[in-house]
Structures are given as C-alpha cells and as structure tokens.
Amino acid sequence: MRKLNLLLLVLNIAFTSGYAQTAAVEKKLALTLVETEPSAAGYSKERLQRIDQTIQQYVDKQWIAGATAIIVHDGKIVYYKGIGYDDIDKKTPLKRDAIFRIASQTKAITSTAVMILYEEGKFLLDDRISKYIPEFAKPKVLDKFNKADSTYTTIPAKREITIRDLLTHTSGLDYPEIGSENMAALYAKADIPSGLDAKGKTLGTEIKRLGSLPLLHQPGEKFTYGLNTDVLGYLVEVVSGMSLSEFFARRIFEPLGMKDSYFYLPSSKYNRLATLYTEDSLHHLAKAPESVNGIRLNYPNTNGTYFSGGGGLSSTMYDYAIFMQMFLNGGEYNGKRILSRSSVRMMTMNQIGDLYQGSGKFGLGFGITTERGSARSPLNEGSFDWGGYFGTTYWADPKEKIIALIMTQQVPNSHGDLTSKFKILVYQALE
C-alpha cells in the first residue's frame, strides 16, 4: 500500500508540474502576437475583404495613395495588409511594414514611461511639476491679449501644475499652430516648437522656456489638448537621467520587441519611411512640397536632437500593435512586465470627469470610449484610442479583445471618414 501511495504521489507531482509548464507556455503564447487564419480566431475571411475593397476605392478615387491596416483578436493577427501605393507616380506598392510618422500616437508611449517611473516611486502623480522642472513654478494665466503686437497681461494661477494635469491635458498648456488663436500667436512669438521637426533644438531648453509663458486657463479647470506630453517627456529625462529616446529604447521598445520605433530612423531604414502626401483644391491626392506647415517631410531621417514626447516618433503598425497588446494583457507582453495591472487600469479610465463635454473622455494618455460614445460607434465602452496628425489611428477594445490600426500619410486629408468606416468594417467581420 505504501508503494502504491508513493507511486500515486509521484504521478501527481509529475502531472501537476507538467500542467504548470503547459499553462506557462500557453500564457506566453497568448502574450505574443501570432498571425493566423481569420476563421481560427473568430473572424470571417470573406467579410474582411470589405476592408480591402473600401481602401481600394479611396485609392482609385485618388483620395489617398494607400493605407496599411492590422486587426488583432485575442492576440491573433487576423488582418495585416498594405493596400495602394507608397509612391503613386512610380506605382511602388505600400508594404505592410512601412514606417509611418505616428505623431500624437507618441503620447501613449510617453505616458507609459511616466507610469514606469511612478511605479518605481520616483514621484507622485499629484506632485507639482515645478518640483522636477523649476521653470514651471508660480505659473500665470493669460488674461488679456493684444493681437496687434502679441503683448499680453496675466493673472496668478490658483495653484501649480501637477503631473496628473499634464497626463490628462488639464494643465492649461496649449499647442502652437493648431491651438487657440491667442496662444498660437503667443507661442509663435516665443518660437515654441510643436514637437515635430524642431530643427537644432533640444527638449530641455524648449520646455524650460515654455515654463515661463502663461497658461490658457487655470490648472485642472478645463481640458485643453496641448504640449503637456512634451513636458512629461522632459520629466522622464530629468528623473531617469536618460534621454527620452534612450529611455524608450531600454525600458519599452527592447523589452517588447518593437524593432522599428524611433524618434529618428537609422540610415538603414530610411527607405522604409512612407511617402507623405497632401491634397489639391479639389481634395484629391497631391505630391507634398518639401515641407508642410513648416515641417520637413523627411524629418525622421535627419538624426535630430529634439525628442518630442507629444509627437516625435515614427513606427510601424505591427510595433504599435505589440504596444497595445501589452495593455490588453494587463501590462505584460511575452513574459516581460512593463506596467502593473493597476497602472493599466488607471491609464485606461476616465480621469477628467466632465471637464470635456464630448462623447469621449480622457485617461492618462488615451482617449476613452464612454457609454455615450459607444452608442455612436462600434467601439465598446472602455475602449481606449488615439491617433496622429499625419493620418494614423488606433484603438483597443478590452471587451472584444480587439486591437486595430489604420495608417495613411497625408496632410490635410478631407477623406478622413475612412477611419470611421474602418471601425465599422472591423466589427462587422466578427463571427
């Protein structure tokens, strides 16, 4: 009997050990993107073809040169294509691994860097930013502005800007060029860069100068999309002792296996940068000049020195899908934990209350789909998203376990409704 019990014990240990190893392997596989047949991951291959057809229509009508798109369902890549052209004159196909200027999609990555340091106990989210960047001490708020000569008067701010204010775009900072008229003029006079193609400038120098300028409104009282995440990028540099580029590479890109994400591309990848287009007076595709709104088209290929946390990155849709899968996995990807589940929860929930009256809200670096927003689009409540100036969009839907991105490169683009149609097409193809 003792021998029998011993045998059963050994078998039980072996079974338990084998089960644990199998479970660990399955967990690891689930955390890594795998390309698969749509039918094996709950998608209709036939209905996915509607995406090809819709994008091709936009190409044929000369509304866009081309687009890349990817859909991930529960870690399985069910759609991953480039459609149309990179160079429409030469009929060069747009490859699915093309590198795109992702502009404001940089914000979520910078916000992640901030939360990594927050988890290390380097600061609290309600700390004053002036504790780390003294130039933001004793802020003032714009009172009156003279359009004739850009002079202005100010009033004292009721309180200082916090790190949380910056993460939620409630600090009172605005954007050059695309911001409010008065603040755009004020920033232009002070030569404050938007973050894109800040030739010859460095992040620290420009953020310190920004700190001396007035705010659009009192901190914490309104939602204003602005240079907040550029300030956060410099916070990462100050606290970590690394450049933002180095921090991204060491703490996010390398652990996740994001091999094509950079502020400035290595020369070996220059030829993969997608061609940027504009449109003519009839809203048809047109070759862009060497610069658009003062931004050189080839700025990712210039080995620059300004690392804009708000808009400086270039990347591929595959790399960004990895980044988003990490969030759907609760902060982990392929066995590498980047964030805690708690930080992921905080980043992907409404952090601004009713400060913004639209159907969407804002978390810590992401737009958030509310119940009201879900009533107006296929995305489920709790989905999180954003996009980029040059025509890129992404979202993740935790309820359906969907990640989707569509990328074009065109400014301006009067046919941005392609993004809305893509959202519909992603969900209609679910089995």
Model-derived features: positions:
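Bacterial Sec-dependent N-terminal signal peptides
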Residues: M1-K27
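Short, conserved catalytic-motif segment at the N-terminal edge
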Residues: L29-T32, T36-I102, K122-L124, V141-N146, ...
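Short, conserved phosphate/pyrophosphate- and ester-handling motifs at nucleotide-, phospho-/glycolipid
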Residues: S44, K107, T316
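Active-site SXXK
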Residues: I55, G75, F100-I129, I133, ...
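Short loop/turn microsegments at loop-to-beta-strand junctions
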Residues: A65-A67, V78, F390-T393, I402
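Short, surface-exposed loop or secondary-structure junction motifs
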Residues: K140-E381
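Short, well-ordered beta-strand elements
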Residues: Y394, K401-Q410
